[in-house]
C-alpha cells in the first residue's frame, strides 16, 4: 500500500513538471504559426498589389485604344499645352477621385472610355490651300468616335495679342471652301466686335457647333478655317502662327459630347488597411502614381486611389452567388472555390494627350475598386 502511494505521488509530480512545459511549447508553436500566417498574408498582398498596378497600366492603354504609351516629352507638353481658360479650369478644378459610395458597378460599366471633352489642336491639312497668298490658319482633324456621340458644345478659342491703346477689334471666322467660279474661297462663320484695353492679351471663344456638325456629316467639306482679328489700324491681333515666347497660345477647339449615365445596384464589403490582420476578402488601399511610370502624357490626375482586393474566400463568406454554397455542399470535390474580386468599381476622369497630340478629357470606366467580395 505504501509503495502504491509513493508511485502515485511520483506520477503526479511528473505531471506537474511536464504540464507547464507542454503548454509553453504549444503556445510558442501557435505563436509561430500565427506569425508565419501573417507573413504569408503580407507577401500575398504585396504580390497582389504589384499585379494590380501592372494590370492598371495595361487597362488604361487598352481602354484608351492606345497600343503603346504616347511618347511625349515634358518640353513638348509645355509647348503644346494651351494656356487657355477651359484647360486651366479642368486642371484647377479637377475632380480628384474620391473614396465615396457613388453608384457604378463592374457589370454595368462599358469597357472603353467615354469621351466628355476633347481639346483639338490645329494640324497641317492634306490639301495645302492658299488664301490671299498666305497659308490658311487652322485645320482640325477629329477622331472617328466623335461621330457616334451627340455634340453638345463646340467652341473655337483664339488668343488676341495685347494692345497699347484702347481699340475696337473686329473678329472674323471664315470657313475655307473649294474655289468657286468667281474665285471665292471662303464663307463667313461668325463675326463679332469687341473692345480691348491696354494690358495683357485675352482669350476669346466663338461658337462653332453648327460648322463642326456639318464637318462631321460631310468630312470632305472640312478644308479648314481662317481667323482674322483686326484692330482700328488694320493690325491682326490673332495668334495663328505663334511667335517666339507665344507657346501655348495656338487656336484650338473645345468639343463636348454627351455621356450617358448608368444606374447600378449597391454592394457591401470589408475595408482594411495595410496593417490589418483580417484574413477574409477585403479592400486594401493602393495609390497609382503615373509620374513614377514616366507617363508624362497624362496631364491629370498625376496619381489616383485605385485600391485592390485580397484575402481568403471560404464558402461561408460567399456573398454574390449564395447558390454556389449549396452546390459546394452537394459536391465539395467538384466545385471550384470562390475568389476575392471587385464587386463594385467606379470610373476616373482623365486629361491626357493621345497619339496625335490631341488633348482629351475623358472618363475611363472600372478603374477604382469600391467594393470587394467573394464570387
From Swiss-Prot:
PROSITE patterns: TGF_BETA_1 (PS00250), TGF_BETA_2 (PS51362). Residues 19-266 form a propeptide. It comes from the Eukaryota. Disulfide bonds join 272-282, 281-340, 309-372, 313-374. This is Growth/differentiation factor 8. Gene3D superfamilies: 2.60.120.970, Cystine-knot cytokines (2.10.90.10). Keywords: Cleavage on pair of basic residues, Cytokine, Disulfide bond, Glycoprotein, Growth factor, Heparin-binding, Secreted, Signal.
